[in-house]
Amino acid sequence: MPSINENEDIINKLKMSTITDDIIIQPSIDDLPYEEDVSKNPYSVNCWLRYLEFKQGSPQKQRNYIYERAIRELPRSYKIWHQYLLERTLAIRGKCILENSFEAVNTLFERSLVFLDKMPRIWIEYCEFLMIQEKITLTRKTFDRALIALPVTQHYRIWNEYTKFILKRSIPSLTCIRVYKRYLKIQPEKVEEYIEYLIKIKEWQEVVNQLIKLLDNVKFKSIKGKSRHDHWLQLCEILSSYPKQITGVDVDSVIRSGIGKFSDQIGKLWCYLSDYYIQLAQFEKARDIFEEALTSVGTARDFSFIWESYTQFEDSLIAAKQEILEEDPSEDNLLEFDIIIERYENLIQRQPLLLNSVMLKQNPNNVQEWLKRVNLYSNPTPNVKMIIQTFTDSIKSIDPQLAKGKLSTIYSTFAHFYEQNNKLSQARLIFENSLTVNFKTIDDLSTLYCDYAEMELKHRNYEKAIEILKRGTVSPKKQNTIIEENEPVQKRLFKSIKIWTFYVDLEESFGTFHNTKSIYEKMIQLKVVTPQIILNFAKYLEENKYFEDMFKAYEHGVQLFLFPHVQDIWITYLTKFIQRYAGMKLERTRDLFEQVLSKVPPKESIIFYLMYANFEEQYGLARHSMAVYDRAAKSVDKEDRFKMYLLYIHRASEFFGVNQTREIFSKAIEQLPDQYVRDMCLKFADMEKKYGEIDRARSIYIHGSQFSDPRTSMFYWNTWSDFEKLHGNEDTFKEMLRIRRSVQASYITQNPTLALLNKLNNKDDKDDKNQQQKQQQQQQEKQQQQQQQQQQASTLTKSKPVTVSLPETIQYNKKIENDDEINLDDDEEEEEEEDQLAIKAFPKTLLKII
């Protein structure tokens, strides 16, 4: 701050400059009106401004003279002063800053501030003008004077320019720090900008001090959107990177407190702490920090982060030691190098175990990680002590209800470990202890019982194995006892199919028939069976010649299960029953078929109908067989009915002839879905045609036409057309064409989209005309050969020759006896040009008849 004496010197200097610049300039004739105006109204700002506007193009000295007169009369006029200062600064723009004109403008600014010290715009422009002149000290003092003169509410305008000024490279850092500290007292939220500046000038001690203050202030809100977490990381990074430049801070405790607070950046913070000691060349301490970090982190991500830093640290030590060895290959240096290499190799070997420890710390109930740890101790050289310790720790640590994976695998592997080391008693003890654990699922406990029994089987203790499984299959005395899901697994174990299956397999192999049979019956009683178990039981009884018991087993199976699971049981049951009794027990067999047909869904019923019909054909009556086929055609799934009707018709024709098949054809056409009626009509008409029933066949074609769209069912209409050519006449052929047009029109009405597609496809039909023309030429060649054959045939007959009018492509004469012969003339083209049919020659058999 300037003293009182300095202010007096400035005022005296201003007075002397005013006297020096007070040059009298005579006004011109044009100036007289304005002179008269300002003389009459010397205190009017507008009068002076009008005068200055009139003198816009005059020399600067004349304008300066007018400005001086104006401010002498109106020393506190902001408009006049601001305009005067602006003109003076613009007038010297581009000149050397060492010229006296710059000092004159500085003096003018000082004169204005004597009267306008409360105007921040004047202060700002003055300071900006001083910054152009690179007068650092004077600029700083002027900013300070502005802060003293202006009220606090306007300080922000000064500080915005002040901070820009001090951030210049030419400003000493100590000055900047002092100014910024004053600034933070007014606006403490700008501390982040201050920290960025300190980082830029590498004042690390002050950076740490400001960050600590910032973190101590719980109410601080970042204007840059940073969180306390970000500031913590920034502080730890700076502390670890520049430990020699920072004093008075317990870096170890600061970083460790951050590790306790921010769990998502634990790995990075541990690396910062180790880097701190590395920068201080305390390598052993840094290594201890790394080891502590690897054993304390709880996530694989943090572990990998620390592991990378640790290995890079060891690599750098090895590289540095190699350089030392090249310069001084002494024994001490070589020994130290060997120690570093051995330590590094040991670290690499321990990596899987260290990572496994982290994973187990993250979830101690992870079964797979415990087993992985056992494998790590087993390879390459088994460490028996650590393997046993790992198994023991896993059993103590894992909560059976929270286990991730099959906990039974831990106990089984532990027991087999003792077994492989010829300690069978210890293995039995492990299994016995495991059988009392309250596992999460029955499958775990049943697996242990089975593994226990398998171990005894390996050592040929068959009775011991059976006794173990017998213990596991003990059921409640009361059959209807309800076991809740929250009961221990030991009380629910008798419901395990796995242990029962193993038990019955052992009894079949090493036990008696009656014991095995009783076990199967117990399983059926407890309903712990599958369809395959029922089939196995029945097969076992069959092998031992207990046929009625076998059928009882099948009966139990069909009562326990529903379709589709029971299908194999029913098929085997019926097959075995028919093989056993053939036709001796017809009614009982029929009852079985009726029983299964009353339960089977339509989609799966076809096989049983076929078995039933085949049985009736072999051992029953053909009439009964036809009744079964008739039921099947009505009851099977819609997709199977067409095949069923075809089989029905085939068998009926073999047993009863054509008359019976006509009735079946009629039923099929009535009951089949529309997509199958067309094919059935073709087969029906073909059958009638074979037996000479032409009118019946034509009626069938007419009936089936309503299900045949001419655009998609070309085969149907071609077949009918060929039929009419061979067996019809001109009227019937025209009737066929009429029906075809009618059906096509009805389908177009029902499905206009298909009609549109048909029009689009017509374009492709035009491309086929060339091929059709080639075919017509080939037909003409065949026509000539056919005419020669007909002429030869006409010489053999004495009947009246009849000329048949055909399309232009084919014409020939032939002799016929009936007057209903088809006479295809040009009328067909008049009715519909699109219905051009391929004309075939008359069969030789028909010529012989004629």
From Swiss-Prot:
Top-level taxon in the UniProt lineage: Eukaryota
Keyword Kinase part of the UniProt annotation: no
Keyword Transcription: yes
Name of protein: Pre-mRNA-splicing factor SYF1
Annotated compartments: Nucleus
Comp. bias intervals (Low complexity): 772-792
Basic and acidic residues bias: start-end ranges: 761-771
Region (Disordered): 761-837
Keywords, alphabetical: DNA damage, DNA repair, mRNA processing, mRNA splicing, Nucleus, Repeat, Spliceosome, Transcription
Originating gene: xab2
Ranges annotated as biased composition (Acidic residues): 818-836
PANTHER family the record matches: PRE-MRNA SPLICING FACTOR, PRE-MRNA-SPLICING FACTOR SYF1
Complexes and interactors: Identified in the spliceosome C complex.
UniProt cross-references to InterPro entries, sorted A to Z: HAT (IPR003107), HAT_Syf1-like_N (IPR055433), HAT_Syf1_central (IPR056350), HAT_Syf1_CNRKL1_C (IPR055430), Syf1-like (IPR045075), TPR-like_helical_dom_sf (IPR011990)
